[in-house]
Design a protein with these regions (language model features):
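A glycine/proline-hinged amphipathic helix-loop "lid/cap" segment
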Residues: 1-64, 296-303
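Alpha/beta-hydrolase superfamily serine-hydrolase fold, recognizing
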Residues: 47, 52-303
Length: 303
């Protein structure tokens, strides 16, 4: 994992720590993963499609149950990343859960500030339901900003009377755009990927003219009651630690089933190193097992 952490720091954190924040540079470095070698599960099929007017990729592992689905929102601070660059992560979770994953190419800020990504998430979620996937057979998956988008989508679904998914698996979710102090400062040096120096710029790029404290932007600022079971994975060395721990605490206080698994000293989004890093394989197996069980099927693992 040291090489993975070093590469992530050099590619992303160095751009986030530069004297001036060049969002285009940050985006390019976040997206370089799509050009790096990756290994996908044997027998995986990739099917580009459009759902609710949004470009998506269906990732269907061999032996998957087609009566259920997982909708995946990628990370990237709302300004970068893509379903393509995070395909390996989504594909290996799909294999572990024996469930097709719909990876969403939502619109990015600053060209498309809030509510563009949020609207895309809701459109795809609604389209998957309309296609006949029962809510009890539907899960959500999200990492970093995509984790925040997943929780925001669940809040909105509840508020609008749309059926909620059966469960959500979240990787180091960014859940409070207004947060300061705490792990944001305590882990500023130890976080191998993220940096605070231009955090306000990223928030402004996504929030635009909207209040970043709005629950659909910062789900930890909202009422979590009624949400489905959630599994959260986070590293103790990253600046988003407080978001994950806060979701567990606030969720349990609201009567939810939320488990936050804390991993020691790993880089942000270490799961994206699957299948090369053993820590990533173990984490992805856990994510897949959680979703597999919640969506009603025996568990399958990552090799």
């Amino acid at each position: 994992m040291r090489l993975t952490a070093w590469g992530a720091r050099r590619l992303v954190k160095s751009a986030l720590e530069a004297p001036t924040c060049d969002l285009a540079l940050v985006r390019r470095r976040m997206g370089i993963r799509r050009w790096l070698p990756s290994v996908l599960p044997s027998g995986l099929t990739v099917t580009p499609t459009t759902l609710g007017g949004v470009r998506c990729d269906w990732l269907t592992p061999r032996g998957a149950r087609t009566d259920r689905a997982i909708v995946y929102f990628h990370g990237g601070g709302y300004i970068g990343g893509s379903a393509r660059s995070m395909r390996a992560l989504a594909a290996w979770v799909a294999a572990a859960a024996r469930t097709p994953v719909c990876a969403v190419e939502y619109r990015l800020a600053p060209e498309h500030p809030f509510p563009a990504a949020f609207d895309d998430a809701m459109a795809v979620y609604g389209a998957v339901l309309a296609a006949g996937i029962a809510p009890a057979r539907l899960g959500l998956l999200g990492d970093s900003a995509g984790g925040g988008l997943a929780v925001a989508a669940m809040l909105a679904a509840r508020d609008r009377g749309v059926p909620l998914p059966a469960a959500a698996a979240l990787i180091s979710p960014w859940l409070d755009l207004t947060a300061a102090g705490g792990s944001r400062e305590a882990n500023a040096a130890s976080d191998d990927v993220l940096a605070l120096r231009h955090g306000a710029t990223l928030v402004a790029a996504y929030a635009g003219t909207h209040d970043p404290a709005h629950p659909y932007l910062s789900p930890l600022r909202g009422d979590l009651r009624g949400l489905p079971p959630m599994l959260v994975q986070v590293s103790t060395s990253e600046i988003l630690l407080d978001d994950a721990v806060g979701l567990e605490a606030q969720g349990r206080a609201a009567g939810l089933e939320v488990t936050c698994d804390r991993w020691e000293g790993l880089p942000h989004d270490w799961q994206a190193a699957v299948p090369f890093a053993p820590e990533a394989r173990v984490a992805v197996r856990a994510l897949g097992a959680f979703l597999d069980a919640r969506l009603g099927s025996p568990t399958s693992g990552v090799g």
